[in-house]
């Protein structure tokens, strides 16, 4: 339940992904004066690109509903195509600053099954999942997706590349594609669609070398080597938070007071990369805690004796 605040504040939210939109919506409903700044023309962040992938079109509702609610609040201003720097944030002088700048897929092999990078890699062959969605490669190519994330993204990205006419090989250290989907009832559907699309699947293999138009793999159990011909390798291993603005602001903390800034926080994928639902929760929680930080221990822990006040 959103409770109207007794002390209205000015809040700047940077980034309009699921976390930024939810934080803006709740802050506005609480009665705070909110400015939402987005560097691109279209609001939505990762939702915009992921909703275009096979089977994920309904995800755009996460954005659409929140934009509808934001448009109903006269105390929320939205500024698209507004790239923010530490100087511009300080110049605006909002009391609280919420950084929701998201995260980007890494271009290395560090993931759940590996704590080290490729032994050798031609970085011209390495392309991130974000780069594929933002700038699709038009010429027909051979893609190898290395999925050490084990959820939906590796599978749907493989389907998207196959739909574009590319030859796709999906490699995973796990025993099945989308292994985490076993807990969300998505694994069977994911594997079925991948196989129907004609995508070559190689399970129980890790990637070691990316050079000279091929990727060198080895079995995680037997150590048996395997070489796969490819033009590009797409590591789906982990996301790295985009915290440049947050870090820059924190390095200038001595200038906050003179510019009216009281607090700077990061939320959503910028704080801890996860699924869209987690980003929405992070945005909601940051908004309701804007005045009073929430303590799960204080509010929900069962105690033998009442707290002494």
Tell what function each PLM region has:
Residues 45-95, 181-208:
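N-terminal Rossmann-like dinucleotide/flavin-binding domain of flavoprotein oxidoreductases
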Residues 213-218:
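Short polybasic amphipathic segments
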Residues 209-210, 266:
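Generic beta-strand structural signal
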Residues 3-39, 43, 78-93, 101-182, ...:
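Rossmann-like dinucleotide/flavin-binding elements
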Residues 207-208, 220-222:
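Short polar/acidic secondary-structure junctions
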